[in-house]
Amino acid sequence: IARVAEAVERILDGVPLADDSALLVLENSAGGGNGIGESLDELIDIHEAMAARGLDLSRVAYCLDSAHLWGAGVEIKGDDEVDRLVEQFDKKIGLEKLVMIHYNDSKAAHGSKLDRHQHIGGGEVGTRGLAALIRHPRLAHVNYYLETPGMEEGWDKLNIERSLQLSEGTLKLKPLPAEEPKVKKAKKVPAKPAAKTSSAKKPAVKKPVAKRSVAKKPAAKKKR
């Protein structure tokens, strides 16, 4: 925790404050079993460690990733669980410091420490938890970003539509279409042109017919 706070201090010291300065945004992790910042308690500890070092916290903000929360074992399955998360964040850090949510479902089991993003409503978090996140009245100021898979295959449009449906209170979404396995298309090898055949018939060659020689019989002599 102390090393993270020290690293943030060095970053801020190395970038002079200006009118167009960007925020340094810290995001929770799924954990992987040995990471820092996987739980809300650890984010709170980092925040307090930075404050203890006298850092300018107006230059620091936070992002929560729903798939990371789920993988780390944070409960976000419904309204009550999300209420508790929001209340704890506001009490210890302040909701004004939460500027973005990476909005993803998860293929991983709850508390698995795995980071496996999934299409909206197609994973383990489910529509109730995701709807609770995007509809929460105290998170209206937050920007939501999709990090779902299949960007190059055109899935973004579908995930945006499903997110909007959840934001409007529609929990029953249509089943996701089957994902086609990525198969590399074989390069087409141009076919060799077929040998041209001449349709003109060769002139028939008549073989000479052998002439037969017919020997004439000698004329019979008349008897006197």
Please give the residue ranges for each predicted region.
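Histidine-acidic metal/acid-base catalytic patches
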Residues: 44-224
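Active-site acidic/histidine proton-transfer and metal-coordination neighborhood
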Residues: 1-61
